[in-house]
Amino acid sequence: MSVSYWMIEGVGLNAADIESHINKEKAARFFPEQFPEEADLKDMVLTGDFSSFDMEEYYYGNGFENLADVLCYCDDTDSLTFGDDGDGTAYFYYPPSMPWHHTSNEPQTEQEVIDRIIKAVQKITDMTEEEIKKIINNDLYVVGCG
């Protein structure tokens, strides 16, 4: 039996920290962009009744791996990523890279990374900028194992 190890390193957050702040209406309005064929989502948006929306129905291979994966799609810059530590804890973060690996959409400062995380989180939650800043770890360093 072999074991793999990997690093989750950068600026980011534990996705579980935002779960209780998810706004069903915001999330249900976001999901049709990702699943245009889902009639139930379209009906929710048209009727304005979001009571039956369960975001977790779209996790674990049903579109997304987990909440951190959803947040990656909320980031319109395609520069943030997600990782799982092997024990089910998912992180949404920006991994550091060398300047010669940067693409044109790379953030130039730590503040720009934080702003991108805030914007993505606010797309599906009711959290304020200050609330999000409190849960962002500027020195995220987790060893995954599986």
Explain the meaning of each model-derived region.
Residues 1-126, 130, 134, 146:
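Acidic (Asp/Glu-rich) sequence patches and key acidic residues
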